[in-house]
């Protein structure tokens, strides 16, 4: 006898989803101690955290691929929240890194376009969190550039312009925003948050998670624990506990 026939299947369990969309800082976020891994751990049995980070990508490319990642479907397929975290590559200096560089005005327009696309597939602004690029430690990043045989291709002051543009898009569109560029420089030497001047160190991952979680928590606080706690499973007939709606 098939397993489903023997026990009765119950309704399919559909996990809510949190989608992280961004560049390498998102792609690497599932490494040990990463901010994405911390989110997944915090939300286990409540929500799947999907990593859709693409190392080296800018908003021009992100805008093109977003419709391939999220399409209009039934309400159960709609992510409970989406983070959009770009700017580290867009803000590269045009003369030194023309492939990744995106003009400031286009960067803002691309962010706005992505927020508008999400709205068109029934993900409203209140489910979207924009994240500004992190500050750049120029001395550390220049060392990496020299190793790769190139000149310093980013400046923190320029990154700040892109961070401000991200803040303005969030204000215009009505989304939440996490201003990492400002927060990381607020009280101490921010270089400790960065492993190579650009990407996050363990301390930087912890910093991002601690500031992002309150924004995420507002959007997932009503999610129940999926399936009962083990002590609450009916001993004689576990099917009574395990084939219901799982809201325990």
UniProtKB/Swiss-Prot annotation:
Enzyme class: hydrolase
SUPFAM superfamilies with a match to the protein in the record: SGNH hydrolase
InterPro entries in UniProt: GDSL, Iah1-like, SGNH_hydro_sf
Top-level division of the source organism's lineage: Eukaryota
GO terms, molecular function: hydrolase activity, acting on ester bonds; identical protein binding
Active-site residue numbers: 24, 196, 199
Keywords: Hydrolase, Lipid degradation, Lipid metabolism
UniProt site (Transition state stabilizer): 56, 89
EC number: 3.1.-.-
GO biological process: gene expression; lipid catabolic process
Modified residues (N6-succinyllysine): 63
PANTHER family recorded: ISOAMYL ACETATE-HYDROLYZING ESTERASE 1, ISOAMYL ACETATE-HYDROLYZING ESTERASE 1 HOMOLOG
Its biological purpose: Probable lipase.
Name of the molecule in the record: Isoamyl acetate-hydrolyzing esterase 1 homolog
Organism from which the protein derives: Homo sapiens (Human)
Lineage, broadest ranks: Eukaryota, Metazoa, Chordata, Craniata, Vertebrata
Gene name tied to this protein: IAH1
């Amino acid at each position: 006898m098939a397993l489903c026939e023997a026990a009765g299947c119950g309704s399919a369990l559909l996990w809510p989803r949190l989608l992280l969309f961004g560049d390498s800082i998102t792609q690497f976020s599932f490494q040990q101690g990463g901010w994405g891994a911390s989110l997944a751990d915090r939300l286990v049995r409540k929500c799947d955290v999907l990593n859709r980070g693409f190392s080296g990508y800018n908003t021009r490319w992100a805008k093109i691929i977003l419709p391939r990642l999220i399409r209009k479907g039934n309400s159960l397929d709609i992510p409970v929240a989406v983070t959009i975290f770009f700017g580290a590559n867009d803000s590269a200096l045009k003369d030194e890194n023309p492939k990744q560089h995106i003009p400031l005005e286009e960067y803002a327009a691309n962010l706005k376009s992505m927020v508008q696309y999400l709205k068109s597939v029934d993900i409203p602004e209140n489910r979207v969190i924009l994240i500004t690029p992190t500050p750049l430690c120029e001395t550390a990043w220049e060392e990496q550039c020299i190793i790769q045989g190139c000149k310093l291709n980013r400046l923190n002051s320029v990154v700040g312009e892109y961070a401000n543009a991200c803040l303005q898009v969030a204000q215009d569109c009505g989304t939440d925003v996490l201003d990492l560029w400002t927060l990381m420089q607020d009280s101490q030497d921010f270089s400790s948050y960065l492993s190579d001047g650009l990407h996050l160190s363990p301390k930087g991952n912890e910093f991002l998670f601690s500031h992002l979680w309150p924004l995420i928590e507002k959007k997932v606080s009503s999610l129940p624990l999926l399936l009962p706690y083990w002590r609450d499973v009916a001993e004689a007939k576990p099917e009574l506990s395990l084939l219901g709606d799982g809201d325990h």
